[in-house]
Every structure is written in structure tokens, then in C-alpha cells.
UniProtKB/Swiss-Prot annotation:
Tissue: Expressed by the venom gland.
Modification after translation: Contains 1 disulfide bond.
Phylogenetic placement of the source organism: Eukaryota, Metazoa, Ecdysozoa, Arthropoda, Myriapoda
Compartment(s) where it occurs, according to its Swiss-Prot or TrEMBL record: Secreted
Gene Ontology molecular function terms on file: toxin activity
Keywords: Disulfide bond, Secreted, Signal, Toxin
A single cellular component GO annotation: extracellular region
N-terminal signal peptide: 1-25
Family stated for the protein in its record: Belongs to the scutigerotoxin-01 family.
Main localization category: secreted
Annotated protein name in UniProt: U-scutigerotoxin(01)-Tl1a
Length: 52
């Protein structure tokens, strides 16, 4: 039960991170949003792998 709650919390935090990345991409046009989004996806995959 606790693990399920933790995974839900992590997913919620990732959604917040993705949202903030999309917003901050407008402030920094030098860095394309695609690369930032890929970094977020990679960290999400690694988190899911850690949870098994």
C-alpha cells in the first residue's frame, strides 16, 4: 500500500516537473524543449525500473 502511494506521488511530481519544463522552455529558447522532455522521460523510466 505504501509503495503504491509513493509511486503515485512520484508520478504526480513528474507531471509537475514536465509542466514547469514546458513553461521554462519559453524563457530559454536556446534550449529546445525536446531535449528537456527526453531527460524527464529518461528519469521517469529509471524510476520505474528502480521500483521494479
Amino acid at each position: 500500500m505504501l509503495a503504491k502511494a509513493m509511486s503515485l506521488l512520484m508520478m504526480f511530481l513528474l507531471v509537475l516537473v514536465i509542466g514547469s519544463v514546458m513553461v521554462s522552455a519559453d524563457d530559454a529558447p536556446a534550449c529546445p524543449v525536446g531535449t528537456k522532455y527526453d531527460d524527464v522521460l529518461k528519469s521517469c523510466r529509471s524510476l520505474l525500473e528502480l521500483q521494479g
